[in-house]
Amino acid sequence: GFHMTIDDWNEGIEGELDDMFAAGITSFKMYLTYPAMMIGDGAVYSALKALKKRGGIAGVHCENAGVIDARIAELKAAGRAADVSAHPEARPDYLEAEAVARLLRIAEAADAPVVIVHLTNREALDEVAFARARGQRVYVETCPQYLALDDGVYYDANWSMAARYVCAPPIRAEENQRALWRGLR
């Protein structure tokens, strides 16, 4: 299916949802990171409410953009801009978990179901369990790289090999991989 991105929110965009739904597009993607694509918490709340009213749903990429940007600036200042091992340092698992928890509280306030995309770690998965225990409808998507690989891929001495694994959120430590497999059961 098609997933349209919501990267801004206003009355005009809300009105466009009706056209999208008429065309059969009922799932949308939003980002809590990437400055060119992310929308603020209030916009996420409004979009979730509008989607719920129409029977739609949003998948949300959860990372804490502000702190990640600050960490990237620190790593660049330390001369590590081209260091692949700096990638997971800039985007630690707890910043993903914080964004997941924040999204879930926003979805709770909107009384709307939500999909968390690219979930990578145990702490974020725990936040999902807490939300489900509160009665929320939460769906989770992970990816093969998070189930099959661990963060050791970023420390390959061959830079071009290590760089192949740069993705966001990053591949995590092995204990997170095990938690994801348990979550699939």
Predicted regions and their residues:
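A glycine-rich helix N-cap at a beta->alpha junction
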Residues: 1-2
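Active-site beta->alpha loop and helix N-cap motifs at the rims of alpha/beta catalytic domains
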Residues: 6-11
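Histidine/acidic residue-rich metal-binding segments in metalloenzymes
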Residues: 12-185
